[in-house]
Amino acid sequence: MNNLERLRQENPLVVCYTNDVVKNFTANGLLSIGASPAMSEAPEEAKEFYKVAGALLINIGTMTKANEQDILEIGKIANQQGTPIVFDPVAVGASSYRKAFCQKFLSEVKVSVIKGNASEILTLVDATTTMKGTDGKTDLDVVEIAKRAHEELNTAIVLTGKDDVVVQGGKVVKLSNGSPLLAKITGAGCLLGGIVASFLFREENPTLQVLEEAVSIYNIAAEIAEKDQQVNGPGTFLPKLLDQMYNIDFNTYQQQVKRQEVE
C-alpha cells in the first residue's frame, strides 16, 4: 500500500492550529485529500486530541500576544504525546516580533518538519533577513538555504517556491511540479503544511519519500486543475484544486512527478 492509499484508508486526524484567513480552505483541502481535520486550539483539550492525531500543524499567520502561550503549550503537549509537528513560520521575516517568537518556539518545542518559502526558512537561521509580508524573495541558493536550516535546526525542511526543496536525513530533492495559480489564492501554502501533516502518520522522523510525495501530489493536483477547460482564473481554479486533490491517484503521481536528487 502506498502512502496516498494509506492516508485515504486510515483517514488520519490532523489537528490544525492555523491562521484565521485559511481555516476553511485548509479544512476542505484536508477533507479532499482524505484526512480528517480538527481546528482545535485549546490547550485544555490538546492531550486528548493528540493521543489519536496523526500530526499537528502549527501556523503562526495571524498570531497575537494573546495566543503565544497557547502555541507554546500545545507544542509541548504534542511533544509529550509523541505527535509530530509541522511548523509553518508564516512571514517570520516581516517583523522582529515574529522572529523572536519563532526563535523561542523552536528552542522549546521539537518539530518534525518546518515548511516555508526561502525567505522564511532563511530568517530562521539568519536573523538579519527581512521580507515583505508573506511573499518574501531572496536571490540566495534555495538548496543551500534548505540544507543549512536542516543542519542547524535538526529537522526536515520543506522549502517552497518555483521549485520546492525537501531536505531530510542529509538528503536533498528538488521538486518542480505546481501551478502559478497557487500564488493567486490565499492559503495555498498554508494548506500544503496541512497536506504534509496528513502524510506523517504519527512518525516524528518522517522519511524523505513521504515528504516529497505529500508535496508533489498536492502540486500535481494543482497542475491538473489549472488545465481544466472551466478554469480561467483563481476563482475557478480553487474548487477545481479541491476536486483534483480528491481524484488524484498514486499512478498519476508516479507518471507526472518532476524530481531531481541534489548533492
Curated annotation (Swiss-Prot):
Principal EC category: transferase
Ligand binding (substrate): M39, G187
An example Gene Ontology biological process: thiamine biosynthetic process
Protein's pathway: Cofactor biosynthesis; thiamine diphosphate biosynthesis; 4-methyl-5-(2-phosphoethyl)-thiazole from 5-(2-hydroxyethyl)-4-methylthiazole: step 1/1
Keyword line: ATP-binding, Kinase, Magnesium, Metal-binding, Nucleotide-binding, Thiamine biosynthesis, Transferase
EC number: 2.7.1.50
Required cofactor(s): Mg(2+)
Any GO molecular function: hydroxyethylthiazole kinase activity
Function: Catalyzes the phosphorylation of the hydroxyl group of 4-methyl-5-beta-hydroxyethylthiazole (THZ).
HAMAP family for the chain: Thz_kinase
Family from the record: Belongs to the Thz kinase family.
The protein, known as: Hydroxyethylthiazole kinase
The organism's taxonomic lineage, starting at the top: Bacteria, Bacillati, Bacillota, Bacilli, Bacillales
